[in-house]
């Protein structure tokens, strides 16, 4: 992942990489009936994390920003759920890759939760405070 000049990871890049990695995993898992449906859900949820983060950064209001960040957190949690359901078969390499993605989904959930708590706190303290793009 690419770091910004301040040494922090670009969250837009991180969510994009997460979605791409989930798609890479989808190509490696056994094509069972349950995996096919679970994979569809997993791919949708993982892509939605980054898409909603982009929408949050382009939000027109504070309420819209908070709503989009909540959706990001929800989709990251959902991604984790679908990742955990996937049957990796007997391939330990695929299982380890899946476990890394479960960890990344957990970290993204925590990051969006922290952004949400900080933003809601700032919003309650000063409702006129502009919070758009603060975490970009």
Predicted regions and their residues:
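Short, C-terminally biased terminal segments at protein or domain edges
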Residues: 1-55, 59-136
């Amino acid at each position: 992942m690419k770091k910004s000049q301040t040494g922090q990871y670009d969250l837009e890049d991180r969510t994009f990489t997460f979605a791409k990695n989930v798609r890479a995993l989808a190509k490696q898992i056994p094509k069972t009936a349950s995996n096919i449906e679970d994979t569809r859900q997993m791919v949708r949820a993982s892509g939605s994390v980054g898409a909603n983060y982009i929408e949050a950064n382009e939000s027109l209001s504070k309420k819209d920003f908070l709503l989009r960040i909540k959706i990001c957190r929800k989709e990251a949690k959902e991604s984790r759920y679908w990742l955990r359901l996937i049957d990796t078969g007997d391939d330990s390499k695929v299982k380890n890759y899946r476990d890394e993605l479960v960890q990344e989904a957990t970290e993204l959930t925590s990051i969006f939760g922290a952004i949400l708590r900080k933003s809601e706190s700032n919003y309650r303290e000063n409702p006129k405070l502009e919070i758009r793009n603060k975490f970009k």
